[in-house]
From Swiss-Prot:
It comes from the Bacteria. SUPFAM superfamilies: Aminoacid dehydrogenase-like, N-terminal domain (SSF53223), NAD(P)-binding Rossmann-fold domains (SSF51735). Homodimer. This is Bifunctional protein FolD. Its EC number is 1.5.1.5, 3.5.4.9.
Amino acid sequence: MTVIMDGKKLAELRLIETKNDLLALKDKYQITVKLVIILVGNNDASLIYVNNKVAKAKAIGMDSEIIRLFEFIEEKKLFSVIDDLNCDSTVHGIIVQLPLPPHIDALKLFARIDSRKDVDGLNPINIGYLNIGANQGLIPCTALGCIDLLQYYVTGLKGKHVVVIGKSNIVGKPLSALLLRNSCTVTICHSATVDLALHTRTADIVISAVGKANFLTDKHFSGNLAFIDVGISHIYDLQTHKRKLVGDGDFLKIKDLVKFITPVPGGVGPMTVAYLLKNTLTAAKLIYASIIDNDNEKRLC
């Protein structure tokens, strides 16, 4: 029987752990950890995601703030906001909600955020630490969530052949690096891959992060160990006449062909939020440690 990998349940466990660590940090050092989320523009879906993050932060006793900015804000003004947050000692985590307006250079933006406060793990310094296998820096939240789901439900990742579909800087690349750190054999597939099914059907684990509704079907699977679905798409349901959330994989066609599978929603999404807050706690500890050490080279500004 196929096991549904319940991301909501596991995320709640991780949130409880983070809540307890926050309380301990506050009791010992009187630190109130704070996350700031910058939202550029009026994307309704982005606002829903941001509000969910704020609600989860509040539930575990973490301060948070949303900074809403005009869609057509000049890049230099956005960077100025980030510079101020970098220097603010009461702020421990900074993220800019994606997607961004096209006139904003995402790579320049990621590099602008202080790497110690980059709780999305997208600053080039953090990406560099991840790729060289250094035990420091902050790791992208979705990648951490996927690995946690696999380690929680699947016995042993070492030596497993994992096919990652998608090569984005947000999910595909950092996830592949983290899988390599866990001694997996990794194949990265993308839009130019010839005969995708040839790769997926022979994999132990398939992880898809494309954002294309239900494009993976039964033809792509054949008794695989696990399928992790990172993709999120909204489609119109002809039966209910409402929009619904689906993943990259056609769940009903795939679920009996794998031993473990994540649902959409309720799989990777909650884990991403849980690790965003866990990363913010980690960032606070790193920043406070540098203050205690009185390390001038590590001062915020």
